[in-house]
Amino acid sequence: SSAASDVYKRQRYGDGESFAKKFNPSLQVVCAQNVERSFKGNAPSLALLGETYPDEQVNTWIIAQLMDLYKFAGVKEKPTFQQVLELSVMIRVEYYYLKASELLLFFFKLKTGEYGTFYGVVDPMVIMSALIEFKAYRKRQLEKYDREEQERQREKRYEKQDKNSVPFPDHLEFLKKIMESE
């Protein structure tokens, strides 16, 4: 990535710390209240964050979401730092295309129990398989938004055609005149 685009990204999202503050776990609720915007908005993807900030900073941001989840779930057995770090790296690498807003939405849905529950232990495998389910949900949502957009475009075209077209009875009148003049 070019130096100019790096500068732009940093201006837009600030340094790693201000990005982390802006996209903190409390924003999960906002993402859940604005599902369409979470998917279609212009929040940066994990890949873009990786181009803009050192990997450690991106991992730290994901770890903050995970720690928030552990705190929410009230887990008895706290995971080791190594486990949390490894999980954050797996999420960053495997789901590089997810936007920050989508990941926040995922953690919100995870907390609501939509992808199963945690019994005293937050199993990394449960989180990874929940991400697979979320990926399918994301695909359905994006397809739905795409269909809705195509429908809007079609309606616009029809409205435009209607404005530019001659009403049907006038066509018949015109045709009648042509027929009579022959």
Name these PLM-found stretches.
Residues F72, K76, E94, G113, ...:
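Surface-exposed polar/charged interaction patches
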Residues S1-Y8:
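Short, small-residue-biased leader/transition segments that mark boundaries at the very start
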Residues I62, P79-F118:
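Short amphipathic alpha-helical interface segments
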Residues L104-Q153:
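Short, cationic/aromatic linear interface patches
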Residues D6, E17-F23, G116, V126:
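Signature of dsDNA virion morphogenesis modules
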